[in-house]
């Protein structure tokens, strides 16, 4: 055996892979484009993971809410209890900015509006299918205020207490607790 043949055996085997060892290579792309492509892929993967986690959390929250509602209302005795105490959740009170207070009484189908100075109170009867929004109520009150005022005694005689009339103090029982609390001490006007 000669010395030259030993050297041939000590050499490393040839590399048949497409990319050099230890380097990820994309053929025919400059280095800065390769780095940009890697950054874009990493950012997209991070966004996909975050959106997936948020959607899973939203799904779990929705399922939990549905389960709690089903447990609280689903039982027959719970439905009977809600039917018996239905009058407890029939009013909604909204602060109308600094201009006043609005009370919706869904059981009696009454809406009461008291302006902030508190000198009068407007009461409106509604139908169950056409309960006005706060904006519609504001327009109606503003239209009522823009009309010329007719003395209430004339209204009581002619129209039998129609729009714009003021009731006597004995009529407050039909208004309910929330509306009579809001409007108990000031003159009432029916719109």
From Swiss-Prot:
GO terms for biological process: respiratory gaseous exchange by respiratory system. SMART domains: BRICHOS, SF_P. It is found in: Secreted, Extracellular space, Surface film. Gene3D superfamilies: 3.30.390.150. Residues 1-23, 59-191 form a propeptide. A lipid is attached at residues 28-29 (S-palmitoyl cysteine). The keyword Transport does not apply. InterPro entries: BRICHOS_dom, SP-C, SP-C_palmitoylation_site, Surfactant_protein_propep. Pfam families: BRICHOS (PF04089), SP_C-Propep (PF08999). Residues 94-191 form the BRICHOS domain. Pulmonary surfactant consists of 90% lipid and 10% protein. There are 4 surfactant-associated proteins: 2 collagenous, carbohydrate-binding glycoproteins (SP-A and SP-D) and 2 small hydrophobic proteins (SP-B and SP-C). Pulmonary surfactant associated proteins promote alveolar stability by lowering the surface tension at the air-liquid interface in the peripheral air spaces. This is Surfactant protein C. The gene is SFTPC.
